Amino acid sequence: MKKAYYGDFGGQFLPESAMFALNELENAFLKFSKDKFFKKELSELLKTYVGRPTPLYFARNLSKKYQHEIYLKREDLNHTGAHKINNAIAQALLAKKMGKKKIIAETGAGQHGLATATAAALLGLECEIYMGATDVQRQALNVYKMELLGAKIHAVQSGLKTLKEATTAAIQAWVGDIKNIFYVVGSAVGPYPYPKMVTHFQSIIGKECKMQLQKLNKKVDYIIAAVGGGSNAAGIFYDFIKDENVKLIGIEAGGLGVDTLYHAATLNKGETGIIHGMKTKVLQDDLGNILPVHSVSAGLDYPGIGPLHAFLFESKRAQYHAISDEECMQALKLLCKEEGIIAAIESSHALAFLEKLCPTLKKKSVIVINLSGRGDKDMQMIREYKKGVIYG
């Protein structure tokens, strides 16, 4: 496998002006990811600041309902409320080691923006966040938190005003001042080395999960995670990829249905194309134009996907299914009532797949769901969904 690719997917599809920064980043990542002092400092931050390891929680009531052993990897209990901080704090620390004074990031649901702003405050870095204007409205709480932490928010007004446009704006800002800015990419997407680097920093989820299962003397049969760009899924999948006995299942945003125009099911409905500096699966028309996407979740409405997932899909090492807005919201309510946990809308897509998977299983199975974030940020969206405001 070529270093910049997963099979046919990955690469560096950016202007020549960006190549210096990508090479600089690759060299720094390769150097510091092996540096014992960097690793020790990051490990200490993850333990004492982020709150790792996160628990692997046996969901007793869900297990009783579905007649299988269901465990939740509780990334929602991290500082800032999601898995995003694992990667953001590592990249921010890397930026500091590289002598950068300013970091920028794109964000959809606001969790990566919040994590980046948090890391910037801790490490004394200037921070600017690019967020689609639509997402600024539906994630107002996270926007206020980011501003409170000292970040400057750019509400992107172009296109659908969501994650794709925010990412494009962040890349443009980075390329415009490439020597001084460090771009903290939030998902396992973008030009190499970003997909590899983000997966590396998020792989702590799967490493912990593996150790926790061993302590419980359990062998996992299925691992399920929501997929937008794909960082939480890459994080929990990575250490299990070589174990063919473990079935890996990614859940895309089915929106109003994959046979409508209102979804973000990139692997189920997309084709190979180029987006945000990488070759991957993309939702595009016959002319190669990126299609508009929809999801009730601000963190999953992305028309591309990380190249690792495109490779796992093509090689059939992982399965990818779509869950609709309605199925997701029903799962969110079910977890609240059964386990007393309010999950993020993104994570609830993964939970919803239990309803489809469990009736098909012939033997009692051990199922791990990556609960990638908590639902505090989604309260307004959940209320609007119940009222039917989202769809008019």
Curated annotation (Swiss-Prot):
The keyword Membrane does not apply. InterPro entries: Trp_synth_b_CS (IPR006653), Trp_synth_beta (IPR006654), Trp_synth_beta/beta-like (IPR023026), TrpB-like_PALP (IPR001926), TrpB-like_PALP_sf (IPR036052). It catalyses: (1S,2R)-1-C-(indol-3-yl)glycerol 3-phosphate + L-serine = D-glyceraldehyde 3-phosphate + L-tryptophan + H2O. The modification N6-(pyridoxal phosphate)lysine is found at residue 84. It comes from the Bacteria. Keywords: Amino-acid biosynthesis, Aromatic amino acid biosynthesis, Lyase, Pyridoxal phosphate, Tryptophan biosynthesis. GO terms for cellular component: cytoplasm. GO terms for molecular function: tryptophan synthase activity. Pathway: Amino-acid biosynthesis; L-tryptophan biosynthesis; L-tryptophan from chorismate: step 5/5. The keyword Chloroplast does not apply. It holds the Pfam family PALP. Its cofactor is pyridoxal 5'-phosphate. SUPFAM superfamilies: Tryptophan synthase beta subunit-like PLP-dependent enzymes. Its EC number is 4.2.1.20. Tetramer of two alpha and two beta chains. NCBIfam families: trpB (TIGR00263). The beta subunit is responsible for the synthesis of L-tryptophan from indole and L-serine. Belongs to the TrpB family. This is Tryptophan synthase beta chain. The lineage of its organism: Bacteria, Pseudomonadati, Campylobacterota, Epsilonproteobacteria, Campylobacterales. The gene is trpB.
